[in-house]
Amino acid sequence: MDVEVDSILLAAHELKAPLAVLRQLALSFDGMDTANERIRSEMVSVSERAIRQVNDLTRIKRLDERLFDMEPVAVRAVCDDVVKELMYLFRFNQRDLYIKYSNRANLVIANRELLRSVVYNFLLNAMHYSGVETRSELVVKDKKDKVRIVIRDYGPALPRDVWKEMKRGWIKKPTSIAMRPGSSGLGLFIASKFSRYMNANVGAVRHRDGTSFFVELPISKQVSLF
């Protein structure tokens, strides 16, 4: 593994304990007025998102161990789970989230936790780069023998070099995305790593007013019970 990436993974592991302490500290505050309760909720939300990314980075470290089994996964249930977790954040930041499921095939071959992280990181990226009072989009649809999950934002254009890496199917390491201020590219790096592990097609489409990120997974032949 790249030395720079390895250093990032090591640093992330060291951050896990203090982030957990921060979360517990925020949860321990009681009897607050409305304004302070809002601050507390944001502290908890920020710490939980940071812990999730640390956990994702830890998973990247373990991908070579082939511990993540592939199995039939209900794609809509995964997306619903992510939306439920992030909807508060979208509303807090005055963003809308449009959701459309048109897929007939509900089961895909994937690892549930890795797929959840892919959708989570793409959606978090979309929320961050869509402007205030604009919307992000989550669309799930059939594409021949696959199911495609598309996350669309209306933010600054994705730099061409990052787009080429996504088109190739994976990002080598987190990079600063100059046209998207404040980005480390960490979420895209995580999503591309997990997608590659699952042998999923992953990529991006550049628009004049934003970017669509997608991941495609093979349809499971198992009959869905959902």
Per-region residue spans from a language model:
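Short alpha-helical segment of the dimerization/phosphotransfer core of two-component systems
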Residues: 45-53
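Conserved micro-motifs of the catalytic ATP-binding
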Residues: 64-69, 107-110
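Conserved catalytic submotifs in the C-terminal HATPase_c
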Residues: 71, 96-106
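Short helix-loop "hinge" at the ATP-lid/N-box region of the Bergerat-fold HATPase_c
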Residues: 125-127
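Short conserved segment of the HATPase_c
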Residues: 158-172
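Conserved glycine-rich
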Residues: 199-200, 204
